[in-house]
Amino acid sequence: MSDKIIDFSKIEKDILKFWTENKIFELCNKLSQGREEYVFFDGPPFATGLPHYGHILSGTIKDIIGRFYYQKGFHVERRFGWDCHGLPVEYEIDKKFNITDRNQILKMGIDVYNHECRKIVQKYTNEWEETVIRMGRWVDFKGSYKTMDLEFMESIWFIFKELFKRNKIYRGFKIMPFSTACKTALSNFEASQNYKNVSDPSVLVTFKIINPKDVLHNYENNDIEIFFVAWTTTPWTLPANCALVINPDYEYAIFYINNNSKKLYIMLKNRIEVYFKQFCITTVILGKELIGVSYATLFNYYENYITRGFFKTIGGNFVTITDGSGIVHTAPAFGEEDYNIFLKLGLLKPDEIPPCHIDENGKFTIAMEKYVNVPINNDISLNGVYFKDADKIILQILKPHLIYNSRIVHSYPFCWRSDTPLLYKLIPNWFVKITDIREELLTQNKKINWIPETIKYKRFQNWLSNAKDWAISRNRFWGTPLPIWARYENEIYNYTDLICVGSIKELEDLTNTKITDLHREHIDQLLIEHNGKTYKRIEDVLDCWFESGSMPYAQNHLKGIKVNNSLIDKLDNINLNNAYLIKENFPADFIGEGLDQTRGWFYTLHVISTILFNSPAFKNVIVNGIVLAEDGKKMSKRLKNYPDPMNIFNKYGADALRMYLISSPVVEAENLRFNENGVKEILKTLLIPWYNTLVFYKECQIQNHNHTLLLDAWIESELNILINKVNIDMSEYKLNNILNYALDFIENLNNWYIRINRKELKNNGLYLKTIIKRFSIVMSAFVPFFSDYSYQIVCSDKISVHLEMIPEYKSINSDFNFIKCIIDGIRHLREKYKLKLKKTLKEVIIVLDNININKNLFEKYEAVIKSECNTLDIILNDINDYSISTIIKPNFKELNKNKNVIKEKLDIISKLTVNDIENIKNGTHDININELLIETYIKDIEYSGVFITLELF
């Protein structure tokens, strides 16, 4: 039957209407009340934009797991969530109102700005619900949580205060990835989400040594100048240069180039030849002898720092011999190692900002007209120039100081939201201490079942091993305000005297003010008077990832936890209305999201649960890859390189798309190039054959008594094999083989059971009804629409397949598969010798390795074999009557699993004889039977259990 005749989309819409009118999802939840809980956490999507294939993929995975475990007898709460705060929302508003500076927001008013943010969050709700419902996903939208809701925000305050009380929160200055478009710092895991290959300058810059005798103690020639040579890919940082770092343990060389011995240069000895073909080394000197040497500044704006020890060479072990010149230009305002070494040497105080010429817009704040000792065009100015655009101007200004000027292509981080280059800059921020809990994070990770497992031991473990303190404050407006009030005197915050607020009631008591909303416009003006001192709230808001990482507790309005040493004690001592929800719903049995969340939601969940409960937040996680366009590029609305998901739903149906996605490597963290033909193939191979089964069933009479057919036990055995395989794979959270299992069964059902028994089934299809019903139940988590359509055809007296439980697996012995192999073998020979089925055979000779055992079996199915193969006679012969030869080969697929012993085993296999096979089968040999490929031949014909010879008329 052609797929053009069958409108699967209409079938699905009819089923969807049936679900809605009969409230099937609500009925499932009602019927499962009181069962054991299967806990699922739904990662909240950002409430901006429309759902794409990535959302459909992860939503399909979540829906399948939820439906399946409901059918396994659990109560599964499937509550939707919305991530409402943060950069994604603010960035949309900034674009809408052409906001480029935070002063524009302050002029607009935080209340007006946040009102616009709230509106855009609510804008996409209906579109999201339409897509989620159409894809067949069952979630509770009415009971959904929003991170902007008052109770959720209050719970975030409580969690933050718990961390604060445990000394896990601190304020500090750190080099942070900063989004100049969003005007805020990002966390390290946000910065790692969007790397791109870019071309940047690769230059060697010279710094003139003020007193050459500091380097050459016998220096007497006043005509000679000596320069340190530093390599950089960021010329825009040179105006903030404060020192040059040299490795004290390396050998450096004084040399000249271009036969100009009047200008001497110093750099790492073994790096000179990387940049210069012709050079002459005059002196070799150890790095430690070059430390403390003063040099002339390139720019004169920070000369007042000279008296503090700036603009000298300092020692640092982070200087490597593998790149650059071995001398590192150091700008502590823009480099983590730069800043840390300045703190270590006491050149900067912990609360001091070093020289910095870039503002929050990423633009230069100083004009460069007064450049020292270099004549420049008066038209050149850097004031207001974007930092990445400044490189060309800086290089033009510094042309006399450049002895090497090239380009380099390297990976550079971009803002994950605005897609603009990140600026690494020293910024005051509030942090969660991570470095002192790394080992515990790694320990808790061992308790988690990751699908695929490689994520656990590679990507996530590596990230945890190198995790840095988490920057959780954002100098923004739309978010949960940081619940910290600092002593405030003379318009200056005193960060050593803080009050952390953990609930609405606590804030009401401290301010004597009724609180109805916790957003900035409602609480920024609230002052706390305590012990004669005034406290004012820190203006920052919390990172939205802190909110999503707290959702297991905040979604149920967590507050008032009392913490003891063990998880059970902690949960037993919770003192709040919804305490039982926390205890019953933590940790989650399952979560699932994309690969990028290993540094996002998975990570923040893990950090917060480890600190609060010394426990992982989830037990099992499926990590999916990225759905790309067919050309391998990122899906882009601008490029129009992918079909609209709604068009796919309308053309092929959601079931086909669901099965296409979960049967691909994308469910094991691999990328998928979306191909519409792949969706169409699901119709061709699964849904249309299944539909044809139902068409045949409608032609059958249903008698009250069941008439047993020869293949009933076999098809029931095949169904139970399917049930068992699905149960095993789903218990291991492996989805990508489900389609193959279903295809095997539908092939056996249609092309064997029904075809062979067509006449008998038409007279009584009662047993076929049972098989279709149970198959529909097994498949209902994966293809929810068509499974219910199928179920309702064979079970008109029942409500919905989704109220049924998965059938119990029963081990049923069936001998027909052996006969099936015989029939397939005969068909193969017909095809090989181009003998059509209508050509009747005189006889078929079948050679068996145990004729006595199999003779009765052949007698049982003799009529089936003759009919299926169109032969008049079947002759059985014994293998022992033939001369046979056996070839033993290594099974490299199995041997490659342990490459340490593969050479040794290959040597053993090369010496094996036929006499060794029995011992190998019995397990009394060094070689495992699975490590071999054993081929048997009769008269050069390959033997795989039976030989078949066709005798023609």
Curated annotation (Swiss-Prot):
Can you tell which superkingdom this protein's organism belongs to? Eukaryota
Q: Which residues does the record give as ATP binding sites?
A: 637
Query: One biological-process term from Gene Ontology?
Result: isoleucyl-tRNA aminoacylation
Question: Keyword Cytoplasm: yes or no?
Answer: yes
Gene Ontology CC entries for this record: cytosol
Q: Where is this motif: 'HIGH' region?
A: 45-55
If you read the UniProt record, what top EC class would you report for this enzyme, in one word? ligase
Subcellular location(s) per record: Cytoplasm
UniProt family annotation: Belongs to the class-I aminoacyl-tRNA synthetase family.
User: Motif 'KMSKS' region in this chain: where?
Assistant: 634-638
InterPro entries referenced in this protein's UniProt entry, alphabetically = aa-tRNA-synth_I_CS, aa-tRNA-synth_Ia, Ile-tRNA-ligase, Ile-tRNA-ligase_type2, M/V/L/I-tRNA-synth_anticd-bd, Rossmann-like_a/b/a_fold, tRNAsynth_Ia_anticodon-bd, Val/Leu/Ile-tRNA-synth_edit
Describe the reaction catalysed, as an equation: tRNA(Ile) + L-isoleucine + ATP = L-isoleucyl-tRNA(Ile) + AMP + diphosphate
Print the keywords alphabetically. Answer: Aminoacyl-tRNA synthetase, ATP-binding, Cytoplasm, Ligase, Nucleotide-binding, Protein biosynthesis
Q: Which coarse location class describes where this protein primarily resides?
A: cytoplasm
Under which name does UniProt file this protein?
Probable isoleucine--tRNA ligase, cytoplasmic
EC number assigned by the record: 6.1.1.5
SS bond partners: none
* Pfam families according to UniProt: Anticodon_1 (PF08264), tRNA-synt_1 (PF00133)
GO MF entries? aminoacyl-tRNA deacylase activity; ATP binding; isoleucine-tRNA ligase activity; sequence-specific mRNA binding
